[in-house]
Regions:
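Noncatalytic scaffold domains of N-terminal-nucleophile
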Residues: 1-35, 39, 47-214
Length: 217
């Protein structure tokens, strides 16, 4: 990996703005998620609190790349020591290689998924190293899911690209959730509200992250 080449490829934003902070900084792929992390720092939280809140919020407003159904890893530096948290996900315990002889099963539907580790990693990090109450960590993501966020150009383009795949799933569950009226892509700037996800996150907030794996969820 050529670090110098990567750094030289970075370009400043068109407005030439930069961010400066004395006590902490949060960076993510979506403004609402970044705000969630900053909110934790303002409440007196540490870097772990900010990272956990940011990750949960990304799962709401960046569903194409983040979410409760994904896998996550973490690298942290605490008290002079560095730690890596391996959240690589695995196939369900009852899965068998014969399931995946069909190419479609390897790409689409529930059989193509692995056991999600994202929430377990976030919960572990918060339990072990976090400072703020768990409910405060989850609160921003609940609010974003309830109030919604504006669909980006990338999300619109991905919905168009994957439209056939969405509609090919027998249950149409993905189409009902991610497409407008379950049929067509959202337009850029449309507000995307996720009431079901807000309820799920509210349960996670109230009962802890383990409810996702061992509880009613």
């Amino acid at each position: 990996m050529n670090i110098e080449q990567i750094e030289n490829s970075f370009e400043p934003t068109p407005n030439k703005k930069c961010s400066i902070a004395k006590k902490g900084m949060v960076s993510s792929a979506f403004p609402d998620a970044t705000k969630a992390g900053v909110e934790m720092l303002k409440k007196g939280g540490n870097a772990i609190d900010a990272a956990c809140a940011t990750a949960l919020a990304l799962g709401v407003c960046e569903p194409q790349a983040s979410g409760l159904g994904g896998q996550s890893m973490g690298i942290i530096h605490v008290n002079g020591k560095s730690y890596a948290i391996d959240g690589s996900s695995r196939s369900p315990s009852l899965a068998h290689s014969s399931i995946y002889t069909n190419k479609k099963n390897r790409r689409l539907g529930y059989k193509a998924t692995t056991v999600p580790s994202t929430l377990a990693v976030i919960g572990f990090l918060h339990e072990r190293y976090g400072k703020l109450e768990w409910q405060k960590i989850v609160a921003p993501s609940i609010n974003i899911a309830k109030k919604g966020y504006k669909i980006t150009q990338l999300q619109h383009d991905l919905q168009e690209r994957e439209l056939e795949n969405f509609l090919s799933i027998k249950s149409k569950s993905g189409a009902k959730y991610f497409l407008k009226d379950g049929l067509v892509p959202y337009d850029v700037g449309d507000r995307f509200i996720q009431e079901d996800l807000a309820e799920t996150l509210a349960s996670i907030s109230e009962f802890g992250y383990r409810v996702f794996y061992q509880g009613e969820i």
